């Protein structure tokens, strides 16, 4: 899904000036190369990283959200279903010092080696729910925004990486004027269950993509209920928070030759 020719989100980033400084391998357009500095790799001769000091040199590694941590699922969430898996291979590990990331404001920071990738488990989030919350989540669908990354391009990430900072939407919500969501007419807009079930093990997991979220569709009695965007974001943030505690996440310290699926 990283193809800069076919993926609308990757194309959009390039059109905005490719601030991420990421490039695809000419012979394998679905493979995107991330990093910092000059490279000559499988026919790709470029300077990676653009203006960002993210790869091992700052607290963030995201173009979106001003360089803050962003928990996410790889995928466009528009026009195409998410992939079955994400695959990352380390050619050359970043150099530099690691840092403590105080993402929850609880005095329990994440230790992030230079250029590390953090993983959170939707299964842990689901298992941490109460019985009533699980029942509610199992009856919940997530409606995603049309062209979600373009729509939210200017919004910063929240400190905990589980939502976005959207002052206008927050003000409407706080004023009691938030309208419920409504299904989109765009045929490429995506709707998925909030809870995904592994077909092999039957284990269940919360699997939202917070940045792309438009609203939640829930069930109240026999009726379907559509929540507003801020109410939906707050619910997802609350449900996912237990999965991003420092002792629950996995931080991968990249070494040359590592392959992570």
Task: Kindly label every feature range from the protein language model.
Residues 1-258:
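Non-heme Fe(II) oxygenase catalytic core, chiefly the N-lobe of the double-stranded beta-helix
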């Amino acid at each position: 899904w990283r193809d800069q020719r076919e993926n609308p989100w990757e194309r959009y980033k390039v059109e905005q000036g490719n601030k991420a400084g990421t490039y695809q391998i000419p012979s394998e357009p679905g493979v995107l190369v991330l990093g910092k500095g000059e490279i000559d790799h499988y026919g790709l001769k470029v300077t990676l990283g653009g203006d960002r000091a993210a790869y091992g040199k700052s607290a963030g590694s995201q173009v979106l959200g001003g360089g803050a941590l962003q928990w996410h699922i790889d995928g466009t969430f528009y026009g195409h279903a998410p992939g079955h898996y994400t695959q990352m291979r380390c050619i050359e590990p970043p150099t530099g010092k690691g840092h403590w990331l105080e993402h929850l404001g609880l005095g329990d920071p994440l230790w992030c080696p230079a250029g590390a990738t953090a993983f959170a488990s939707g299964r842990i989030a689901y298992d941490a729910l109460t019985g009533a919350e699980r029942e509610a989540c199992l009856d919940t669908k997530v409606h995603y925004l049309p062209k979600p990354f373009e729509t939210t391009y200017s919004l910063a990430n929240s400190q905990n990486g589980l939502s976005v900072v959207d002052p206008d939407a927050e003000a409407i919500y706080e004023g009691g004027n938030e309208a419920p969501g409504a299904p989109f007419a765009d045929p490429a807009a995506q709707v998925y269950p909030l809870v995904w079930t592994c077909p092999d093990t039957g284990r269940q997991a919360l699997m939202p993509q917070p940045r792309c979220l438009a609203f939640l569709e829930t069930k109240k009695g026999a009726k379907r209920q559509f929540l507003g965007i801020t109410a939906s974001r707050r619910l997802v943030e609350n449900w996912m928070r237990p999965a991003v505690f420092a002792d629950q996440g996995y931080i991968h310290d990249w070494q040359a030759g590592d392959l992570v699926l």
